[in-house]
């Protein structure tokens, strides 16, 4: 039996690589004669930079930048020559010929939800300013472009914080510049956006690797789907939604040449960061899952597997809209492979195309979240053991 173990992260508990290693070791313990391949699914969130840079033996750099709450954090990014990127991935990225070296930047390193305490999370006063600082450092280190993994974010600021650090300015109704990070809390004060001078050369290119395909606004938009996990309360949803639409229109009015639209697939990723970086800096949105798949040769591993084991911290409807575990699960079903999806918790999935018998929640249903997070490794080992000690 040939097994492919391909997990995404269990947020606040295990990285994708750790989850894969744990699951593979448990399967191997129960089925020592099986062939096991691992493929961590860093589709834009945690582990994105480490995975892509590490595969190519690229350079790693660190920089002290602003975290979501405007404290300092040491963030890591990678640098790789374009010629070293696998051909299938280069075709997806479609760089201009003058782009010779690119940075691989993980938004979660500077603006990730893991950098904020679970208690008291709120989208109103957190910023992506550190992401902009990280891009600036990477460019000074020799990057001609950047692949930005948009996932695992704490923010819903349309990447306006990043744009602020890269030259954009925000003004009140009297034309006065607002000299602080443009977090949603101060959005009502913003009447105009300007770009007196961009901190990046005009030749600098961005690719925005998203782990979801949600639009910016509406019932499937960034605030509606991902706001609650960032601390957005139901009574303030409409307030944030309305201001998101207004600020998006202001940004497009300033930098309309890049033709970003709120309905663009993936525009709602990372609190609208995909929209903001596309509108403000001409970034191109692409599937993080497809990019990583091409980068690490997942297609070959998948084609050889008889059984696919995948999962993440929360498996819900959004998992089936661009995230690695959901996409891989649908591909496994399509190809008639055996499938096991294991998640910390299972959310609502209307008309789920995956058989319920293939999905299992590793945590006991009534276990409080803090305790469940601490026991994630133990629960994953137990779930794998239960499944494969009894399977045919």
Predicted regions and their residues:
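N-terminal loops that bind phosphate or other acidic moieties
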Residues: 1-150, 154-392
């Amino acid at each position: 039996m040939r097994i492919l173990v391909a997990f995404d992260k269990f947020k606040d508990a295990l990285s994708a690589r750790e989850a894969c290693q744990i699951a593979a070791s448990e399967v191997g313990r129960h089925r020592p004669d099986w062939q096991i391949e691992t493929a961590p699914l860093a589709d834009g969130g945690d582990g994105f930079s480490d995975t892509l840079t590490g595969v190519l033996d690229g350079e790693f750099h660190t920089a002290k930048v602003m975290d979501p709450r405007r404290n300092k954090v040491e963030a890591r990014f990678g640098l790789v020559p374009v010629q070293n990127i696998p051909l299938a991935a280069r075709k997806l990225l479609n760089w201009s010929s003058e782009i010779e070296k690119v940075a691989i930047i993980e938004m979660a390193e500077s603006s990730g939800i893991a950098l904020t305490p679970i208690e008291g999370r709120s989208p109103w006063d957190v910023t992506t300013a550190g992401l902009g600082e990280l891009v600036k450092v990477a460019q000074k280190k020799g990057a001609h472009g950047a692949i930005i993994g948009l996932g695992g974010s704490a923010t819903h600021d349309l990447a306006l914080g990043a744009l602020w650090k890269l030259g954009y300015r925000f003004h009140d109704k009297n034309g006065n510049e607002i000299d602080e990070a443009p977090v949603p809390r101060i959005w009502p004060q913003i009447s105009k956006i300007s770009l007196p001078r961009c901190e990046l050369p005009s030749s600098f290119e961005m690719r925005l690797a998203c782990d979801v395909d949600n639009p910016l606004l509406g019932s499937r938009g960034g605030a509606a789907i991902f706001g609650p996990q960032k601390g957005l309360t139901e009574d303030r949803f409409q307030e944030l939604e309305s201001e998101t639409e207004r600020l998006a229109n202001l940004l497009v009015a300033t930098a309309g040449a890049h033709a970003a639209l709120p309905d663009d697939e993936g525009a709602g990723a990372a609190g609208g960061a995909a929209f903001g970086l596309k509108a403000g800096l001409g970034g191109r949105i692409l599937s993080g899952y497809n990019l990583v798949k091409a980068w690490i040769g997942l297609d070959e591993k998948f084609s050889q597997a008889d059984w696919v084991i995948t999962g993440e911290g929360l498996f819900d409807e959004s998992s089936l809209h661009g995230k690695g575990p959901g996409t891989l699960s649908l591909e496994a079903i399509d190809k008639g492979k055996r499938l096991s999806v294991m998640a910390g918790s299972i959310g609502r999935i209307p008309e789920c195309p995956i058989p319920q018998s293939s999905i299992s929640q590793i945590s006991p249903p009534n276990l409080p979240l803090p305790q469940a997070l601490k026991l994630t490794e133990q629960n994953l080992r137990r779930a794998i053991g239960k499944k494969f000690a009894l399977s045919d």
